[in-house]
Structure formats: structure tokens, C-alpha cells
Curated annotation (Swiss-Prot):
Pfam families: Exonuc_VII_L, tRNA_anti_2. It comes from the Bacteria. Heterooligomer composed of large and small subunits. This is Exodeoxyribonuclease 7 large subunit. It catalyses: Exonucleolytic cleavage in either 5'- to 3'- or 3'- to 5'-direction to yield nucleoside 5'-phosphates. GO terms for biological process: DNA catabolic process. The gene is xseA. Bidirectionally degrades single-stranded DNA into large acid-insoluble oligonucleotides, which are then degraded further into small acid-soluble oligonucleotides. PANTHER family: EXODEOXYRIBONUCLEASE 7 LARGE SUBUNIT (PTHR30008:SF0). Belongs to the XseA family. Keywords: Cytoplasm, Exonuclease, Hydrolase, Nuclease. Its EC number is 3.1.11.6. GO terms for molecular function: exodeoxyribonuclease VII activity; nucleic acid binding. GO terms for cellular component: cytoplasm; exodeoxyribonuclease VII complex.
Length: 519
């Protein structure tokens, strides 16, 4: 009775798997069924651990797929994955048995469209501009003659060669190159590190600190130039204490580093032209300024000499200043002596009639008193005349003393001016004498450089690389037909010429004579 209520035995035809076997089977099915796939979605939850691998999600409105990009492939991606970016990822589907999930191993990645990439770029530009990183007030003037120029670019390629060649032609300068990757995952961190590294160099250190920086790269697509739109690069350019020129892409290409840089150059060659002036133009300007300075100095000396001569003619002579007062003094002295004689004679004439009526004694007393009075007056007049004469002489001597130092100062000032102008003229003459010699040296250096260029571009340099020149009758043979028709050939090698033996020139096949008519 109890057998009727026993459970039926489980079926034995369903295969039994271990967990590892089932996970491996699922892994083989997924990898074999899908293989290489392209998935379009939005990037979310980006993780960059110290191992260098990239872990992120690809999602849409209804599902999420885990994605992995190994370290070796992450550095070759054309764009840097960021959260919110819409991309098309190419890779292989696989599973991770340890967590029972499927995932895609990304091998390549591209933006889902130029419109999406431009929208993200515009959003980033607006955010950085709102912080003031692109303000014109932050931009600094470029140095006129930078002593050291730092270049951040790839060490190989046409960009660095164009910059060095242009700098060498215009004004040779000391150039420091910081090699970086200009495309891919490593581009942005290496460029930012190079800008900050140049700014960290100390003044007076073993490596000279640049006076100007150039960040350069050739043209490319928006994805190729994306590293220069990264926020880390823009912030490094804005924080640079060294003036910076951005020369990324062609004239039509614009990246965010162009807005943060102090100057933007349309091409790397134009950046070199912005960095330094033309040396020959500066030398020509200096020669012109030297000539103008010489003319101005000569004209200044001539005008001052003429003014000195005019002042010398206008200044009265010392003899003429003293002659008038001295003559008046002599006249007054002569008049005073005559006046004294006349006064004595007049008084004697008045006294003689009176003396005739006086007694001799009284007359003698009167005469004695008058004589004493006259003697006193004479002494008083003599003293007064002496004092007036001394005062007049002192006044003349004081006037003469004031005029003599003034004249001496004027003469000394004129001599100092002449000596100073003569020294300046001598220095200018020395510079003018040295200018032709310096110009001859510059011309000799330029001639030597042109001769080296001529030797480099000459065909004899080509002969040294294993080529040869074939001539026939003095003309260069360039075709096989001309060589076959030549009577002899002369071959020029690096170390001499070789003449091949004469031979008869090949003739074209003669046409058979036409058969004559029997009629």
C-alpha cells in the first residue's frame, strides 16, 4: 500500500555538469557564436586601476554590458573613454566564470558620431571657459628674443624638423625637446606632464629653463587630435608660468589647448615664426639705427660748437668792462687837483686886501689859523678822496672777481661738453669701424652655409651612395634606347670615370626592297 505513495525516481537521461564544466561550455558557446562584434552604447563607470587596464560599462536604456580593455591595447585607443561618451566598441565576447557574467574584450573604440563628439567637446569648452581658463586677461606677451625654447611634440616626424629648420633660418636658439605621444591614450597625460615639467625646471639649474614653450602636432582627424582636448592638458597650459604657443593641427583645426595657450599658431612652422624674429632684419635695423645715431651725434656736436662760438662773441671782454670806470676815476682825480688849486688861489685873493689893513701880528695869527684850517681841510679832503678811491677800486675789483669765475666756468663747461661729445663721437666711430668687419663675418658664415648646402644637394653626394652617371658624347643618358644607340658610353662613379669600348651603333631593321614590277 505504501508503494502507491512513493515519489517516482528522477530521470537518468539529463546530463550532469560540474560548475566549471558548465561555465566553460557557456564560454565556448558565446565566444564561438559571436566572435568579433561591434557594440554601440554609452560609457559608464570608468575605472583605471594601477595595472593599466580599463574597466567600464557599455549601456543603453535597457541593458548593460561589462567591457575590458587590456593595458597594451588601451594605449592605442584613438579616444580616451569617459563617462557619458557614446561610442562604438569593437571586440570579442567572452565570459568571466569567477562571477558568472559575460563581457566584451574591447580592441578598438571610436565615437558613435562626429555630432556626439562635438557636443561633448562643446560642453567641456563651456565648462572650462566658465572657470576663466580662456580669459584674454590671463594671456601673456611672448618674449622678444627667447634664449631657450621648449618644444613638446613627437621626436620623430616632420613637425619637429619643420620647427628646427625654421628657427635655424630666422634666429638660431637653444631648443629643448620633450618627447611625447601626440595620439592615443598616452597623449594627454604625457603632454600635460611635459608642460608641467618645463615649468618645474629651476632658474640656473643644469638644464636651462625655457623662456617660451611650443606644443605642436601635425594635422589629423578629430579623434587623432582628441588628446589636446583633454581637461588635464588644458589646465596644464592655463597654469603654465612660461608663455606658451599652441600649434596643433592645421589652420582649420581648433582644439581646447588653443584657447588656453597665450598664442595660437595655424601650423608648427608659423609657431617657429612667432617665437623668434628674423636675425638679418634685426641686424639691418641696428645698422640703420647706428647710422642715424652717428648723424645725430655729429649734428649735436656741430650745434653746440656753434652755440659756444656765439656765446663767446656775445660775452664782453674784461678790459672793456674796467676801462670806463678807470677812465672816470682818472678824470675825477684830475678835476679834484685843479679844484683844490683854484680854491686856494681864490681864498688867497680875498685875504690879501684884508691883510693890508691888519697889523702884522694879527695878520700873522690870522694867516697861521687859516693855514691850519686849510691844512685840516686838505687832510680831510685827502682822507675822503682816499676812501672814495679805495671804495671805487674795491667795487671794480669785486666786479672783476665776479666776472672772472663766471667766464672761467663758461669756458670749463664748454671744454667738458667738447670732451664728452668727442668721447661719444669716438665710441660711435669705433662701432662704425667694427660694423663692416662684423657684416663681412656674417656674410662669410652665410656663404659657407650655402656652400655646404650646395655640396649636400650636388649629384656627387648621390654618387657616394652607390649611384652612377652614364654619358654618351658628353650628354647624360637617361633611357635604355639612348644607351643602345650610343657609339660609346662613359660611366662616372664616386672615384672616377670608366669608358666602355666603342661599338657600332645599333640600327633599326632595314625595310626589304620592294619587288619591281615585271610589266
Amino acid at each position: 500500500m505504501s508503494d502507491l505513495f512513493e515519489d517516482p525516481a528522477p530521470a537518468r537521461n539529463t546530463p550532469e555538469y560540474t560548475v566549471s564544466e558548465l561555465s566553460g561550455a557557456v564560454k565556448r558557446v558565446i565566444e564561438g557564436e559571436f566572435g568579433l562584434v561591434r557594440v554601440r552604447g554609452e560609457i559608464g563607470r570608468v575605472s583605471r586601476p594601477a595595472s593599466g587596464h580599463l574597466y567600464f560599462d557599455l549601456k543603453d536604456d535597457r541593458a548593460v554590458i561589462a567591457a575590458i580593455c587590456w593595458k597594451g591595447q588601451a594605449g592605442r585607443l584613438s579616444v580616451r573613454p569617459e563617462e557619458g561618451m557614446e561610442v562604438v566598441a569593437t571586440g570579442r565576447m567572452t565570459t568571466f566564470p569567477g562571477q558568472s557574467k559575460y563581457q566584451i574584450i574591447v580592441e578598438d573604440m571610436a565615437p558613435a558620431g562626429a555630432g556626439a563628439l562635438m557636443a561633448m567637446l562643446e560642453k567641456r569648452r563651456a565648462a572650462l571657459a566658465a572657470e576663466g581658463l580662456f580669459d584674454a586677461a590671463r594671456k601673456r606677451p611672448l618674449p622678444f628674443l627667447p634664449r631657450v625654447i621648449g618644444v613638446v611634440t613627437s621626436p620623430s616626424g616632420a613637425v619637429i624638423r619643420d620647427i628646427l629648420h625654421r628657427l635655424r633660418d630666422r634666429f638660431p636658439s637653444h631648443v629643448l625637446i620633450w618627447p611625447v605621444a601626440v595620439q592615443g591614450e598616452k597623449c594627454a597625460p604625457e603632454v600635460a606632464a611635459a608642460i608641467r615639467g618645463f615649468n618645474a625646471l629651476p632658474d640656473g639649474g643644469p638644464i636651462p629653463r625655457p623662456d617660451l614653450l611650443i606644443v605642436a602636432r601635425g594635422g589629423g582627424s578629430l579623434e587623432d587630435l582628441w588628446g589636446f582636448n583633454e581637461e588635464i592638458v588644458v589646465r596644464a597650459a592655463a597654469e603654465s608660468r612660461i608663455p606658451l604657443i599652441s600649434a596643433v593641427g592645421h589652420e582649420t583645426d581648433t582644439t581646447l589647448i588653443d584657447h588656453a595657450a597665450d598664442r595660437r599658431a595655424p601650423t608648427p612652422t608659423a609657431a617657429a615664426e612667432m617665437a623668434v624674429p628674423v636675425r638679418l632684419d634685426l641686424l639691418a635695423g641696428l645698422d640703420g639705427q647706428g647710422a642715424r645715431l652717428s648723424r645725430c651725434a655729429a649734428e649735436t656736436i656741430r650745434r653746440r660748437d656753434q652755440r659756444l662760438r656765439d656765446l663767446s662773441r656775445a660775452l664782453p671782454r674784461l678790459d672793456s668792462l674796467v676801462a670806463g670806470p678807470s677812465q672816470r676815476f682818472d678824470l675825477w682825480s684830475a678835476r679834484l687837483s685843479g679844484a683844490l688849486g683854484q680854491s686856494v688861489a681864490a681864498r688867497r685873493a680875498r685875504l690879501e686886501p684884508l691883510g693890508a689893513h691888519l697889523r702884522p701880528r694879527l695878520l700873522a695869527d690870522l694867516v697861521a689859523r687859516q693855514k691850519d684850517r686849510l691844512a685840516d681841510r686838505g687832510r680831510g679832503l685827502e682822507t675822503c678822496l682816499g676812501r672814495r678811491s679805495e671804495r671805487a677800486r674795491d667795487r671794480f675789483e669785486a666786479l672783476s672777481g665776479r666776472l672772472a669765475p663766471a667766464f672761467a666756468r663758461l669756458v670749463a663747461e664748454s671744454e667738458r661738453t667738447n670732451r664728452r661729445d668727442a668721447a661719444a663721437l669716438g665710441a660711435l666711430a669705433a662701432r662704425l669701424e667694427a660694423a663692416p668687419e662684423a657684416r663681412l663675418l656674417r656674410l662669410a658664415d652665410r656663404l659657407e652655409a650655402l656652400d655646404r648646402l650646395r655640396q649636400t644637394l650636388g649629384y656627387r653626394e648621390t654618387l657616394r651612395r652607390g649611384y652612377a652617371v652614364v654619358r654618351a658624347d658628353g650628354e647624360v643618358v637617361t633611357t635604355k634606347t639612348a644607351a643602345e644607340r650610343a657609339a660609346s658610353l662613359e660611366i662616372e662613379f664616386q672615384d672616377g670615370r670608366l669608358t666602355l669600348g666603342a661599338r657600332k651603333p645599333r640600327k633599326g631593321k632595314a625595310e626589304p626592297p620592294a619587288q619591281g614590277s615585271l610589266l
